[in-house]
Amino acid sequence: MIAVYNDLLLAADSGQVSALCLLDLTAAFDNVDHDLLLLRLERQYGLRCVVLRWFQSYLSGRSYRVIYVNWTSSIVYIVCSVPQWSVLGPRLFIFYTANLADVVQQYHVNFHAYANDNQLYLHCRRDDMMSVVDRLERCLIAASHWMAANRLKLNAEKTELLWAG
């Protein structure tokens, strides 16, 4: 986020305004498709054999149940998600969503991501703000389609557009 903040300050110093779009993904870590993640780890990052099987073992076989006073729910097996509060969870999410940057960059929009915190931003002159909004809107539509194809969901109600400068 410091890099984004610095870019916004530099743009303001040069007399430009910046549109900053803060993306909110609904239950981001809970929707990571294990098979798709493992396929990406293999094809995009070159993980093979023992290392790939280790990740497969880490992701599979997880379950949970709720115990409350004298009541216990049935066991539910987890077929997708990465553990959010683990050391690996945010990193695996970054690997899973790395291709989103390619989608965003097709629209010449700056993109910064840390785990499930994603920011899109552009700088422009004040008289060019409407074209920036149009480009961001087209970029968000494409990003939303990519997310849907990858079992993720952009929460439009919590996604925010801010102007700075």
Identify the function of each model-found stretch.
Residues 1-83, 122:
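Conserved pre-catalytic core of RNA-dependent polymerases
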Residues 1-12, 130-150:
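Inter-domain linker/hinge segments that demarcate the starts of reverse transcriptase
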Residues 138, 149-165:
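Short, conserved micro-motifs composed of acidic
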Residues 16-19, 108, 155-160:
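Short amphipathic alpha-helical interface segments
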Residues 11-13, 90-127:
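Active-site palm subdomain of RNA-directed nucleic acid polymerases
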Residues 3, 36, 50, 54, ...:
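Acidic, Ser/Thr-rich intrinsically disordered and amphipathic helical segments
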Residues 85, 89:
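Short, conserved phosphate/pyrophosphate- and ester-handling motifs at nucleotide-, phospho-/glycolipid
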Residues 21-23, 114, 121-123, 157, ...:
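Generic beta-strand/beta-sheet core signal
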